[in-house]
Amino acid sequence: MDKKYEIIIFWSSEDNSYVAEVPELAGCMADGKTYREALGNAEQIIEEWIETATKLGRPIPQPRGRLAYA
């Protein structure tokens, strides 16, 4: 993966797994039984998200780096 998107990983008691969200890519998220598994799955889904957007002719946001919160 050459794009550096922010990935937020948190524990979900409801899903009993770690959830990885990619805020810059709408709907891009993954999960895993471990933190590392969630991260690996997120990296894979980012690539798939970009491939799908490219095939559909949709714009691909550039990574913004670290998101700032007020």
What is each PLM-predicted segment?
Residues 10-25:
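Short aromatic-glycine-(Arg/Gly/Cys) micro-motifs in beta-strand/loop hairpins
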Residues 26-37:
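A short, exposed loop/beta-hairpin motif centered on an aromatic-Gly-Thr core
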Residues 1-6, 15, 40-70:
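Short, charged, surface-exposed hinge/linker loops at domain edges
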